[in-house]
Amino acid sequence: MTINLSDFRFVAKAISNKGHRPRELARTMPAHPLSYMELPFDPEYTLYNSRLTPEALNTASDDEMYWAVRSNVIFRHTGELPIEISGPDAETLLNRVFTRSVSKVKPGRCSYQFACYHDGGMITDGLLLRIEKNKYWFAQADGDLFSWYKANSKNLDVQISDPDVWISQIQG
């Protein structure tokens, strides 16, 4: 008997831990701190940026979800991963990584950006927030941009870190 794994969809389900210590997956694939809000909707989770994010809510059909966003407002907890880039050379690094100049982004403002390899292949996209003159957060879609920051930061005075924040979206 041959089983074709492409015929299956693998998801993570939220189950009660009954006060026991967290299992390994809880430490290596964290869920959004507000994911308890999704539990009444019987969510199925998938990995996005090494974080668990809801892929489906089993108490609502795809059509119901579509119309909820079109005619109402939803509060969605996402797997977008913010990375903090700070230091005197932060702007220089980001101008190496992104295709659009970040020099024009003023503190307190955002800019849509996308990162490409040197040959033009796209790595990922997201929103860049300039928090201060030398401090940025980039909320990225799924992709390995952290390694690309590190590869391009040689001889630059920058710090690249996870600011330990999670993103929620208001849609509709």
Language-model segments: what does each one mean?
Residues 2-116, 121:
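Acidic, proline/glycine-enriched N-terminal capping motif
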Residues 79-81, 111, 124, 134-136, ...:
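Structural beta-strand/beta-sheet cores of well-ordered domains, especially the beta-sheet scaffolds
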Residues 119-124, 131:
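Long, hydrophobic/aromatic-enriched structural stretches that serve as scaffold segments
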Residues 127-172:
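Acidic, low-complexity central loop/insert segments
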